[in-house]
Amino acid sequence: MDRVNRLAAQRAVVIFSMSSCCMCHTVTRLFCELGVNPTVVELDEDPRGKEMEKALARLLGRSPAVPAVFIGGRLVGSTDKVMSLHLSGNLVPLLRNAGALWV
């Protein structure tokens, strides 16, 4: 859990992902199209990925634990929460407040 929190706090937007997960790719692409440069942590490519995946599953209360999106060091959630924020118009202000967007 400490590693997850430390990584999440290092950048404005952090996405914990799996390289073969289509929803992870979709969420990452959304942020890129909005002009955000997210830090993507590929759990299946990290030696401590399984440990982080278990910690994220506990935080999210579900499995699979990816994608897990943190904005401004806070857990936002997974695909459903990110898309809900985007469609309601609340994602961009959240990104601005976190310093991930300047415009």
Swiss-Prot record:
Q: List the disulfide bonds.
A: 21-24
Q: What is this protein called?
A: Glutaredoxin-C1
Q: Does the keyword Transmembrane helix apply?
A: no
Main localization (coarse): cytoplasm
Q: Which Gene3D superfamilies match?
A: Glutaredoxin
Print the keywords alphabetically.
Cytoplasm, Disulfide bond, Electron transport, Redox-active center, Transport
Q: Which residues form the Glutaredoxin domain?
A: 1-102
What gene is this protein a product of? Answer: GRXC1
